[in-house]
Regions:
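Short basic (Lys/Arg) and small-residue
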Residues: 65
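N-terminal beta1-alpha1 ligand-phosphate binding loop
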Residues: 2-39, 45-49
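Flexible, gly/pro- and Lys/Arg-enriched active-site loops
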Residues: 43, 50-61, 71-77, 81-158
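Short, structured patches in soluble enzyme cores that scaffold and shape functional sites
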Residues: 15-17, 69, 135
Length: 158
């Protein structure tokens, strides 16, 4: 059973998949995220197609969602890992192709640095597949100069 926080926090979560029917998997994950306990889906970005970043394999389908949640960050992470596991997620090596990848990008304005969780996500500012969909739903969270730094990374809005 999840422990609810006394106040809600606006969290941003990145979604990605490149195995199986990646588009259907990401859309299902958005639906699953909307049903998490003590959580409400606020907004979802468009879907985007990107080549694997520092990896090989099929193209990824990516998106970002905004969630209003009373789950603490650690519990939210556990819920995301559960959804990944339900989609058959395996972690054989770093940047391996994946059925579903869910990452907490931002959790309110909080900074968290534990052995299992780093928020803001430590590599989010380097990746167009995160920044472009995040800027679509929360432009105030992505400085324009940051978007310009990743402009050379190919990304296609679907």
């Amino acid at each position: 059973m999840s422990q609810a926080l006394p106040t809600e926090v606006l969290a941003y979560v990145a979604l990605g998949a490149n195995l199986g029917d990646a588009r259907a998997t990401v859309l299902q994950a958005v639906n699953d995220l909307s049903r998490l306990p003590n959580t409400q889906l606020v907004k979802a970005s468009s879907l985007y197609r990107t080549a694997p970043f520092e990896a090989s394999g099929p193209d990824f389908i990516n998106a970002v969602v905004a969630l209003m949640t009373r789950l603490d960050a650690g519990e939210l992470l556990l819920q995301l890992q559960h959804l990944e596991n339900c989609q058959g997620r395996e972690r054989p090596f770093k940047n391996a192709p994946r059925t579903l990848d869910l990452d907490i990008l931002l959790y309110g304005d909080r900074t968290i640095n534990t052995a299992t969780l780093q928020i803001p996500h430590p590599r989010m500012w380097e990746r167009a597949f995160v920044l472009v969909p995040l800027a679509e739903i929360a432009p105030e969270r992505v400085p324009q100069e940051t978007l310009l730094r990743v402009a050379d990374q190919p990304i296609e809005r679907l």
